UniProtKB/Swiss-Prot annotation:
Entry membrane topology: Single-pass type II membrane protein
Name this polypeptide is given: Beta-1,4-N-acetylgalactosaminyltransferase bre-4
GO biological process terms held by the UniProt record: carbohydrate metabolic process; glycosphingolipid biosynthetic process; positive regulation of Notch signaling pathway; protein glycosylation; response to toxic substance
Organism of provenance: Caenorhabditis briggsae
Cellular compartments annotated: Membrane
Record EC number: 2.4.1.-
Source lineage: Eukaryota, Metazoa, Ecdysozoa, Nematoda, Chromadorea
Positions on the Extracellular side per record topology: 36-384
Database matches in InterPro entries: Galactosyl_T, Galactosyl_T_C, Galactosyl_T_N, Nucleotide-diphossugar_trans
Superkingdom, natural source: Eukaryota
C-alpha cells in the first residue's frame, strides 16, 4: 500500500513538471511580448512595419554636404581665450571634412527592435575596451558609409558617475548601430550651486555648436536608457519628445503636454525657441517651459509610437543640490512674456574646464548662480 502511494505521488509530480515545462514553452514561444506590436516565434522578432514608417516619417532629410550648414557666427562664450581654446582643439576632435564613402541607408540595416538594457556598472577603463572605435570626445562615426545625421547628445550632469557609466554603455551601443555621426557632451555644473537643468542644456548647445557643424541636438537626462533600437536619434522634422514610454510611469505619458526627459531639436528649432529657460534653479518647470516656448514659436511637439520610444529609468535618490523649485509656477506663468529674452539670448556662464574624454566630452561650467539670481529677483521679488 505504501509503495502504491509513493508511486502515485511520483507520477503526480512528473505530470506537474511536464505541465510546467509546457507552460514555460508557451510563454516563451507563443505569447505576445510586452511590446504590443511584436510577437515572438522562436527567437525571431517580427516588427510592426507601420511603427517604423512612423519613425522614418518624423525624420528630417539632411544635406549631402556635411559642412554646408555650419553657422559659426556665435557670440563669445564669456572670455576670448575660451573661444580660442575651442578653435585649437576642433581639428583634433573632429578631423578632416573630406569624405569619399557613400551615404548610409535611411534605415540602418542592423536594427532588431527591443534590445538588452545594460544595467551593470563597468568602470571607464572597461568601457573604453568595449568601444575602442570611439574617437576622443565620445565622437562616433560609421566606417562603412557617411552618416546622414550629425547629432550632438547633451547631458546635464552632476555627481552621478555610476549613472553616467551605465548611460554611456547603452548609448554608444545604440548610436553606433544607428550609423550616426554623433558625440556625447556631458555638461557638469560646479559644486555648491543649485542644479539648473535648462541652463546646462543651453551651455551644452553653445559649447557643442562651436566644435562641429551639428545638425541637431538631443537633450538627454543621464538616468534614461533606451529599450528599442528603432528609436532613432536622428534629426526631427518637428521638435521630438523621445522619452514617450518610461517604465517608472508604466510606459504611459504622465500628462499629454510633457516635453521632459529626452527631447530632439534641429539647430533651427533651438534658435527659434531661444533654447531653454536659464531661470529654473532646482527641480521642475524647465521642461513645461520648453513646451510652451515651442508652441509660442509656432512649432509642434512630435512623438514616436509608444511601443518604440520606450525607456528604463535608473533609480536614484533625491539630491540636496536639486531641491524643488518653489517659484517654478510663477516663472512658468510668465513664459509667454519672457521666452524671447530668457534663453540663449541671455546665456551667461564661465567655462571652467573642457576635456576630451575617450567616451565623452566633459565641460565643467560655473553657471554664475548668485549673479543670475540677483537679476531674476527684479522680475520675481518674492521668490529670490
Amino acid at each position: 500500500m505504501a509503495f502504491r502511494h509513493l508511486a502515485s505521488a511520483k507520477l503526480k509530480t512528473f505530470f506537474v513538471l511536464c505541465a510546467a515545462l509546457l507552460l514555460v514553452h508557451a510563454m516563451i514561444y507563443k505569447v505576445p511580448s510586452l511590446y504590443e506590436n511584436f510577437s515572438i516565434g522562436s527567437s525571431t522578432l517580427i516588427a510592426d512595419v507601420d511603427a517604423m514608417e512612423a519613425v522614418l516619417g518624423n525624420t528630417a532629410s539632411t544635406s549631402d554636404d556635411p559642412f554646408d550648414v555650419w553657422n559659426s557666427t556665435f557670440s563669445p562664450i564669456s572670455e576670448v581665450n575660451q573661444t580660442a581654446f575651442m578653435e585649437d582643439i576642433r581639428p583634433i576632435l573632429f578631423g578632416d571634412a573630406n569624405e569619399t564613402r557613400p551615404h548610409c541607408n535611411q534605415t540602418p540595416p542592423h536594427l532588431v527592435g527591443p534590445i538588452r538594457v545594460f544595467l551593470d556598472e563597468p568602470d571607464f577603463a572597461t568601457l573604453e575596451k568595449i568601444y575602442p572605435e570611439t574617437h576622443p570626445g565620445g565622437h562616433g562615426i560609421p566606417t562603412e558609409c557617411v552618416a546622414r545625421h550629425r547629432v550632438a547628445i547633451i547631458v546635464p550632469y552632476r555627481d552621478r558617475e555610476a549613472h553616467l557609466r551605465i548611460m554611456l554603455h547603452n548609448l554608444h551601443s545604440l548610436l553606433a548601430k544607428q550609423q550616426l555621426d554623433y558625440a556625447i557632451f556631458v555638461v557638469e555644473q560646479v559644486a555648491n550651486q543649485t542644479f539648473n537643468r535648462g541652463k546646462l542644456m543651453n551651455v551644452g548647445y553653445d559649447v557643442a555648436s562651436r566644435l562641429y557643424p551639428w545638425q541637431c541636438f538631443i537633450f538627454h537626462d543621464v538616468d534614461l536608457l533606451p529599450e528599442d533600437d528603432r528609436n532613432l536619434y536622428t534629426c526631427p522634422i518637428q521638435p521630438r519628445h523621445m522619452s514617450v514610454a518610461i517604465d517608472k510611469f508604466h510606459y504611459k505619458l504622465p500628462y499629454s503636454a510633457i516635453f521632459g526627459g529626452i527631447s530632439a531639436l534641429t539647430q533651427e528649432h533651438v534658435k527659434a525657441i531661444n533654447g531653454f529657460s536659464n531661470d529654473f534653479w532646482g527641480w521642475g518647470g524647465e521642461d513645461d517651459d520648453l513646451a510652451t516656448r515651442t508652441s509660442q514659436a509656432g512649432l509642434k511637439v512630435s512623438r514616436y509610437p509608444a511601443q518604440i520610444a520606450r525607456y528604463k529609468m535608473i533609480k536614484h535618490s533625491t539630491e540636496a543640490t536639486n531641491p524643488v523649485n518653489k517659484c517654478r509656477y510663477k516663472i512658468m506663468g510668465q513664459t509667454k512674456r519672457r521666452w524671447k529674452t530668457d534663453g540663449l539670448s541671455s546665456l551667461k556662464y564661465k567655462l571652467v574646464k573642457l576635456e576630451l574624454k575617450p567616451l565623452y566630452t566633459r565641460a565643467v561650467v560655473d553657471l554664475l548662480e548668485k549673479e543670475c539670481r540677483r537679476e531674476l529677483r527684479r522680475d520675481f521679488p518674492t521668490c529670490f
